[in-house]
Amino acid sequence: KLSTKTVTGRKMMDANNNNHGNNNNNVNNNKGPEADGTNSIVSKKKKEYSAKQLEVIDATKHSWKAYKKYGFGRDEIKPISKTYHTWFNIGLTLVDSLDTLLLMGMDDEYEEAKEWVANTLNFDINQDVNLFECTIRELGGLLSAYTLTKDQLFLDKANDLGKRLLPA
């Protein structure tokens, strides 16, 4: 049977819980990063990660370093030619990576990406876009970042983009 649990202020269906809406079991009622500035999304410290988890984080850091060096703020990089590709000129890779950076505890990289979103990301352009890619990567990336952090910046950007995509 399906029932509901509250997750960050929203309800989600949970097939494993049979409390039929009696919501005494909050999964996570945090509202984003803790008041003391720590990232409550990532509760593990690096010393608690397994060797395989650390390898994945290292690989992601390696990829992010290449993205930063060869195409930061661009839609995609071309790792072989060490150049970038501008598909829609809206930082697809950067925005699509926000949740990954958060979940992996890559706080410095996340802050850098967030700063780019705040200061550079602008949808006031006359550009054809692929609706599917723009929706899943850009809109989805902004909404994921908002869901994880509750930072209004991401919701405002998502709302702006969503309104622009709506006529399509």
Identify the residue ranges that each predicted region occupies.
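Glycan-recognition and catalytic cores of secretory/periplasmic carbohydrate-active enzymes
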Residues: 1-17, 22-168
